[in-house]
Amino acid sequence: MPVVFVAASKLPTPFAEFAMHGFIESATGREHVVLSLGDVADGAPVLGRVHSECLTGDALFSQRCDCGSQLEAAMRAIATEGRGVLLYLRQEGRGIGLMNKIRAYELQDGGADTVEANERLGFAADQRDYAICLPMLQHLGVQSLRLMTNNPRKVKALTDMGINVAERVPLHTGQNPHNRLYLATKAGKLGHMMGNEHQSEVGPA
């Protein structure tokens, strides 16, 4: 198996009391977490987010990105829905790791955008791997997702892995003066849909 289930516990948060499920990735030893709320194994599409770790945004309140605000918005949305899943993947810096992310930030301080910085360091613009998502969702009995993301490439990547994405739910939040170039680059070079004109996209049944 690509991932091994370790344990589950309660996780009280300001938004709701989630169940926290821990997994270890067999090939790398990375530890991943899934938060779930309500009955997600009833066969109906589940509101969910696949969120890659961002220490600076999620824990240190960085305004260089929109990651922390997206994480909070996703947890709030799941709590409001009363049902959902959040996959928290340990793929810092779109897969390049924390120290390389800081190196990329240094290049961005000198004028590079987020894609150019990755490429100057010898990395692809996005090095994340979503193959581990399917077995974690299968463990929880999730058959279909209403995926909170602005990234159509993420939808395609998950679909290519055999995950049924019934709908893309936009997640527009966290814009500020410090991340305007970052968000513009995600839209222009990484294909993210950042505008309000795309309210939702329903995929094939």
UniProtKB/Swiss-Prot annotation:
Key word Cytoplasm present: no
Pfam families per record: GTP_cyclohydro2
Active-site annotation: 126, 128
Any one GO molecular function term: GTP binding
Keywords per UniProt: GTP-binding, Hydrolase, Metal-binding, Nucleotide-binding, Riboflavin biosynthesis, Zinc
SUPFAM superfamilies per UniProt: RibA-like
Binding site residues for Zn(2+): 54, 65, 67
Cofactor binding note of this UniProt entry: Binds 1 zinc ion per subunit.
CDD domains (UniProt xref): GTP_cyclohydro2
EC number: 3.5.4.25
Catalytic activity: GTP + 4 H2O = 2,5-diamino-6-hydroxy-4-(5-phosphoribosylamino)-pyrimidine + formate + 2 phosphate + 3 H(+)
Pathway stated in the Swiss-Prot or TrEMBL entry: Cofactor biosynthesis; riboflavin biosynthesis; 5-amino-6-(D-ribitylamino)uracil from GTP: step 1/4
Swiss-Prot/TrEMBL cofactor(s): Zn(2+)
GO cellular component: cytosol
GO biological process, one term: riboflavin biosynthetic process
Keyword Membrane: no
Recorded superkingdom: Bacteria
Residues the entry annotates as binding GTP: 49-53, 70, 92-94, 114, 149, 154
InterPro entries, per database record: GTP_cyclohydro_II, RibA, RibA-like_sf
Similarity comment text for this entry: Belongs to the GTP cyclohydrolase II family.
Protein task: Catalyzes the conversion of GTP to 2,5-diamino-6-ribosylamino-4(3H)-pyrimidinone 5'-phosphate (DARP), formate and pyrophosphate.
Name of the protein: GTP cyclohydrolase-2
Source species of the chain: Pseudomonas syringae pv. tomato (strain ATCC BAA-871 / DC3000)
